[in-house]
Regions:
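Conserved acidic segment of CheY-like receiver
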Residues: 2-13, 17-21
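Acidic catalytic/metal-coordinating carboxylates
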Residues: 35-38, 61-64
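Active-site beta3 strand of CheY-like receiver
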Residues: 46-52
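Receiver (REC) domain active-site loop signature in two-component systems and cognate sites
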Residues: 57
Length: 124
């Protein structure tokens, strides 16, 4: 079972993602964070197997938080999610070292498994 840290400033999105993860046995949400600063702290405390990271958040954005997490653990698995899915935006997300990018409108267990399995770095 993969232990997941959900990072998004929108409680509604976190609730939707938790509901999606609760429908399968392969994933367990172990922590949530509302911004990148809290995500970095939660990652250090919880050591999740996967971080599902939003981009646009207060204090520290998801791109910077991803870089900080990967600086502390280069093997960390971070998947970026965003409402924006333009090619240049996806490239910025992947340039952080994230494992992949999934547009929020396309977020599903199947898309996440594709990214985690290395089949595709971008599900958008």
């Amino acid at each position: 079972m993969l232990r997941v840290l959900l990072v998004d400033d929108q409680a509604l999105f976190r609730d939707i993602a938790k509901n999606m993860f609760s429908s399968v046995e392969e994933f367990e949400v172990i922590a949530e964070a509302e911004d990148g600063a809290d995500a970095v702290d939660a990652y250090a405390d919880m050591k999740p197997d996967l971080v599902l990271m939003d981009v646009q958040m207060p204090r520290v954005n998801g791109l910077e938080a991803t870089k900080q997490i990967l600086d502390s653990n280069p093997d960390a698995r971070v998947v970026i999610t965003s409402m924006r899915s333009e090619p240049e935006y996806r490239r910025l997300a992947l340039d952080t070292g994230a494992l992949g990018f999934i547009a929020k409108r396309d977020l599903s267990i199947s898309a996440l498994k594709d990214v985690l399995g290395g089949a595709i770095p971008v599900a958008a």
